[in-house]
């Protein structure tokens, strides 16, 4: 009886210390990727304009909306790239020198939605995430920051942006994902990275 209890304790503790299983339940990207790829002419145009991979943009569309341009989430994220007007939308407007934020009807327009979402990815990459050296790690950081905010990601490394970037550069891409899985306050963050990568692999 005592031996059985000790064995259970070892298994329990091992489970507590392991990385969360963010790859379950399984997710099949085939249908959402097929629907997202119909917008490739727009994603290629926006990607080239902002220096962002069109494949990454298409993968985010597949994961976020499954290619549905009129989708509105419970948190009021709108359209193909599920943009929140008051956060990402407002940030892009500010960057462009415009006042206010995009309307819901603007965000339901596929071309405008993709343009704003791609611009936001570029702002993240060349702004708060600037300095991340490994391209694969930068992609993962972009994906997490797009869905949960760059601040939440960087604070898992340090309250100081420069120190956080340095710590990120000390990790391999796989170690970065493991860090996110163990430390990010949003439990869906590592799964989001995985789903976007699955979508890119399915193209």
UniProtKB/Swiss-Prot annotation:
GO terms for biological process: cell wall macromolecule catabolic process; cell wall organization; peptidoglycan metabolic process. CDD domains: LT_MltC_MltE. It comes from Cronobacter sakazakii (strain ATCC BAA-894) (Enterobacter sakazakii). One of its GO terms (cellular component) is cell outer membrane. Keywords: Cell outer membrane, Cell wall biogenesis/degradation, Lipoprotein, Lyase, Membrane, Palmitate, Signal. GO terms for molecular function: lytic endotransglycosylase activity. It is a lipid-anchor. Murein-degrading enzyme. May play a role in recycling of muropeptides during cell elongation and/or cell division. Preferentially cleaves at a distance of more than two disaccharide units from the ends of the glycan chain. HAMAP family: EmtA (MF_01381). This is Endo-type membrane-bound lytic murein transglycosylase A.
């Amino acid at each position: 009886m005592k031996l059985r209890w000790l064995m259970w304790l070892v298994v329990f503790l091992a489970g507590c210390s392991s990385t969360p299983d963010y790859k379950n339940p399984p997710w099949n990207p085939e249908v959402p990727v097929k629907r997202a790829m119909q917008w490739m002419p727009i994603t290629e145009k926006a990607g080239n304009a902002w220096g962002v991979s069109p494949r990454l943009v298409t993968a985010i569309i597949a994961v976020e909306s499954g290619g549905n341009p009129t989708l509105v989430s419970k948190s009021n994220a709108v359209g193909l790239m599920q943009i929140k007007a008051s956060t990402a939308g407002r940030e892009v407007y500010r960057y462009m020198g415009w006042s206010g934020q995009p309307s819901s009807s603007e965000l339901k327009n596929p071309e405008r939605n993709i343009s704003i979402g791609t611009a936001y990815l570029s702002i993240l990459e060349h702004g708060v995430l600037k300095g991340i050296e490994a391209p694969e790690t930068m992609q993962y950081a972009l994906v997490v920051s797009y869905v949960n905010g760059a601040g939440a990601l960087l604070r898992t490394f340090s309250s100081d942006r420069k120190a956080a970037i340095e710590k990120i550069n000390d990790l391999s891409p796989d170690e970065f994902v493991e860090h996110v899985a163990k430390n990010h306050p949003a439990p869906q963050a590592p799964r989001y990275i995985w789903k976007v990568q699955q979508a890119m692999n399915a193209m």
